[in-house]
């Protein structure tokens, strides 16, 4: 579960290393976000040659959470970290590579480009 002020790793090659959640999109009083949800985030750490500079406010989709995900078949899945992929205004990923596994729930949310770039979908 991701909420305001949660820090997430960035799982793409935009050059940003860490983002902080500012707002969870999808309702006026929505507090928590899970895998596949879009958030508004601020870039907190970035490399000097990054496409996205430190301090920039961006949209991102969550691809991994440390909080377990309950699936319809009764199984649970959780990851070691919280991670997101930075999006542009058209909800397409800015980066051209995705690092690490991503959850299958990202596909159900309609981010097929991210799923096709990912090395592993769990």
Swiss-Prot record:
PROSITE patterns: RIBOSOMAL_L14 (PS00049). SMART domains: Ribosomal_L14. The keyword Ribosomal protein applies. One of its GO terms (cellular component) is cytosolic large ribosomal subunit. The keyword Chaperone does not apply. SUPFAM superfamilies: Ribosomal protein L14. GO terms for biological process: translation. It comes from the Bacteria. Keywords: Ribonucleoprotein, Ribosomal protein, RNA-binding, rRNA-binding. One of its GO terms (molecular function) is large ribosomal subunit rRNA binding. Binds to 23S rRNA. Forms part of two intersubunit bridges in the 70S ribosome. HAMAP family: Ribosomal_uL14 (MF_01367). Belongs to the universal ribosomal protein uL14 family. Part of the 50S ribosomal subunit. Forms a cluster with proteins L3 and L19. In the 70S ribosome, L14 and L19 interact and together make contacts with the 16S rRNA in bridges B5 and B8. This is Large ribosomal subunit protein uL14. It comes from Sulfurimonas denitrificans (strain ATCC 33889 / DSM 1251) (Thiomicrospira denitrificans (strain ATCC 33889 / DSM 1251)). The lineage of its organism: Bacteria, Pseudomonadati, Campylobacterota, Epsilonproteobacteria, Campylobacterales. The gene is rplN.
